Amino acid sequence: MEIKVGCCGFPVSKNKYFENLNLVEIQQTFYKLIDEEILKKWRKEAPSNFEFTIKAFQGLTHTTKSFTWKRSGLKENEIKKLEKYVGNLKVNKITLEFWEKMLKYAKILNSKIILLQLPSSFNDNKENVEQTKEFLKNVETKEIKVVLELRGWKLENKRKIFEEFNVIDVVDINIDIPTKVENILYTRLHGKYEKYRIIYNYEYTQKELLNIKNKLIKLNAKENYVLFNNSYMFKNALEFLKIL
């Protein structure tokens, strides 16, 4: 089994990051449709064995009610025009164009994984199960692997999606296990959980890092993507590498 370790975003300079880690989940692609030249530059700067995964644009996953749209670079009237068409895996001309853009980003970066991270407001219900299925039926996925994060969903409803479609169930393995484990496991480690709240400002202990390692060994996926998303992500990622 192979364990790849990285962070959700670049918490340090890219040069320092490239020197120490071989994986990153790009966050900029979530907030806005960024210039392709920037991605070409990153691919050129990174080592040949460095892997980028892409967090899909919020226009696919988040409605315009989300505060994250403030970072989209769009004016209020431009966001307002998108209100009826974006988020919650809606399928229409606009969102399909967004998806095509993500595929283009993946090609530039030589990425094989695109993450769809749904907000907690995307509730676990029949309507959203069907909406997720409808989206996955309509998007091109031949050259990439979709990893899907459905926060707070029951196993029963997640199975309706992950057993029908060839997509990966993204979880924080500190609190959950994937619906199914085959070739790829993708885990995002957010920090500490207090009831229904995530404390991102949290540093994992050596004991917790060892526990994560042991869970990965037990689940025994061929390729394991371990992405730290807490405030101490870079420090914890380096510490985790040392114990592998």
Where are these regions (language model features)?
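Residues lining hydrophobic/aromatic ligand-binding pockets adjacent to catalytic sites
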Residues: 1-244
